[in-house]
Amino acid sequence: MDVIYIQDQEIDHYNGQFYHSKSEHFFSRFLAGLNENDTLTVYTGIINRNCAQEVAKYKDVTNPRITYKQVPEFRNPKNLLAINRLMKRVLKDADFCYLRSGIAASFASTICLKKHIPYMAVVNEDIFRNTIAHSRLLVRLSAYPLSYYTHRMVREANYACYVTQDYLQSNYPCKGKSLGCSDIEFLDINELSLTKRLNKIQKQAGTIVLGTVGSVDTELKGQDTIIKALAKLKAEGFTNYIFQMVGTGNVTHRTQSSCRVGDC
């Protein structure tokens, strides 16, 4: 059985091994239900690292039953045709696909629908919200077409797996079978609780700690926005703020961002 997983997002490669920033089971979980002789081919962005330190905090996802193949850099518009050609070639004999929201998956879904190849949409983000407010103009311009094709990919999927219980399901509905796999529950926030919290912050005389939880090496989590805001506060004389980040990934880029705005 020829099973294929497709995503834009990058994994890391060093010394013959492959690494993921979050989980050692990120791809092996898709082997469930396959026979021992079946294999999974993952088409993904791959970053080649030059030293062990760069992947020291990442998870080894090397697996004899998983083959990793390079997808061209999706952020470069010149590669769009190459990605489309690649999808046409690799899906020629595919039996089933896992498509994670993105450009490559959007191309792949068009081919799957044309060739009647069953697939599962892996819906892990609100792709419109993540692109429409991006710092790069080119990414913002891609928000509408990418949103359209992502909505179609999810809507027409045989199956959809969501990382939320309600939010993504309501924004990216699927006509096929779907599953929400989030284990996070949000408490209701009323106006009184919000007012009390804001008053507490305004009366805070000591150090105020700001925190984010999420991958530290992606631009979509908002850490750079906080770093820039803190730099402006510092320039205005407000220095009683500390920013703490919790998450997987290489923190080097965030440190460089801090230095660029003069806060290192």
Residue positions per predicted region:
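N-terminal subdomain of nucleotide-sugar transferases
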Residues: M1-Q53, P64, K92
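Active-site proximal beta-strand in glycosyltransferases
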Residues: D2-D8, C112-T131, G176-C181
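Conserved donor-binding/catalytic core segment of Leloir-type glycosyltransferases
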Residues: I4, N199-K221, I227-L230
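Acceptor-binding helix/loop patch of EC 2.4 sugar-transfer enzymes
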Residues: Q7-Q17, Y68-E73, M120-T150, D188-I189, ...
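Conserved nucleotide-sugar phosphate-binding/catalytic loop shared by glycosyltransferases and other
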Residues: N48-P77, G262-C264
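Short N-terminal targeting/anchoring amphipathic segment
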Residues: M87-A105, P118-M120
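A short, active-site helix/loop in glycosyltransferases that binds the activated sugar's phosphate group
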Residues: A143-L198
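Nucleotide-activated donor-binding/catalytic signature segment of Leloir-type glycosyltransferases, i.e.
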Residues: I242, T255-C264
